Amino acid sequence: LQRSFPFHGLQISSFVNSSQTRTDCLAWLGELQTHSWSNDSDTIHFLKPWSQGTFNFQQWEQVQNELWVYRLSVTRDIHDFVKLLKLTYPIELQVFAGCEMHPGNTSESFFHVAYQGMHVLSFRGTLWETAPGTPPFVKLVVKELNLDHGTREMIQELLNNTCPQFVSGLIEAGRSELEKQVKPEAWLSSGPSPGPGRLLLVCRVSGFYPKPVQVMWMRGDQEQPHTRQGDFLPNADGTWYLRVTLDVAAGDAAGLSCRVKHSSLGGQDIYPVLG
């Protein structure tokens, strides 16, 4: 590996009442969405031709069965905790879990749970732990969860063994797409005036892959600290778009440039020209 690759799954579970629930899951390797799992399906859907990685059919079936058991146990546990703690529906639960592979074939895993949008607990090592500032009832939840040795062992196995093994194969199978390099195009313009005697300079960068990029307004060799970066937006072809602005006095615009650094450029930064 030349760089780290995080593999993370997002689970969203909605409990409307004691009989009406739904759980949907999505997974990403880096910035590429690789899997989805609808509440209405018993099977995980592949979003890439290489989404099975190097696992054979039997290995993948075993993982899918373990995750299916996990999904059922989460639903059961939530309903049990509602009764035990006298909680009220509706309940929203989010789980963010996975592992990150680093150069040297090392990995680290993570498993975080949010209740009603608030981070409440995490799985670390072999045990569940409360997050800082959580409601008092979460301590009781953690105590009960830590008594369930079977589920804890299953999560340890998934996080520490299955996930790194699967993700290593996923990276190998998807290497050509993961290592794809697409050069950015960049152009300058001016935006709506921020005020009397002011200019908003806009540097647009588009069509680049992978996502990490550095875009900075410059005066000579000096980075301009008031450079403001917008959100990364996806293009239809899987590349990215970014807008970076600088608010300056009209008389100070001369001599400013926009510098774009990206891995596809081989160290040759680009400086688009206003025009």
Curated annotation (Swiss-Prot):
Pfam family, one: C1-set
Binding residues annotated for a D-galactosylceramide, in chain numbering: D77, D148, H149, G150, T151
Domain of life of the organism encoding this protein: Eukaryota
GO molecular function list: endogenous lipid antigen binding; exogenous lipid antigen binding; lipid antigen binding; lipopeptide binding
Biological role stated in the UniProt entry: Antigen-presenting protein that binds self and non-self glycolipids and presents them to T-cell receptors on natural killer T-cells.
Keyword Endoplasmic reticulum: yes
InterPro entries found in the cross-reference section: Ig-like_dom, Ig-like_dom_sf, Ig-like_fold, Ig_C1-set, MHC_class-I_related, MHC_I-like_Ag-recog, MHC_I-like_Ag-recog_sf, MHC_I/II-like_Ag-recog
Species classification: Eukaryota, Metazoa, Chordata, Craniata, Vertebrata
Coiled coil: none
Disulfide bonds: C99-C163, C203-C258
Note, other: During protein synthesis and maturation, CD1 family members bind endogenous lipids that are replaced by lipid or glycolipid antigens when the proteins are internalized and pass through endosomes, before trafficking back to the cell surface.
Keyword tags: Cell membrane, Disulfide bond, Endoplasmic reticulum, Endosome, Glycoprotein, Immunity, Immunoglobulin domain, Innate immunity, Lysosome, Membrane
Tissue-specificity statement: Expressed on cortical thymocytes, on certain T-cell leukemias, and in various other tissues.
Gene Ontology annotations of biological process type: antigen processing and presentation, endogenous lipid antigen via MHC class Ib; antigen processing and presentation, exogenous lipid antigen via MHC class Ib; innate immune response; positive regulation of T cell mediated cytotoxicity
Annotated compartments: Cell membrane; Basolateral cell membrane; Endosome membrane; Lysosome membrane
A GO term from the CC aspect: basolateral plasma membrane
Quaternary structure and interacting proteins, as annotated: Heterodimer with B2M (beta-2-microglobulin). Interacts with MHC II and CD74.
Thylakoid listed as a keyword: no
Glycosites: N17, N39, N105, N160
All copies of domain Ig-like, residue ranges: 164-274
Membrane topology: Single-pass type I membrane protein
Record protein name field: Antigen-presenting glycoprotein CD1d
Listed PANTHER family: ANTIGEN-PRESENTING GLYCOPROTEIN CD1D, MHC CLASS I-RELATED
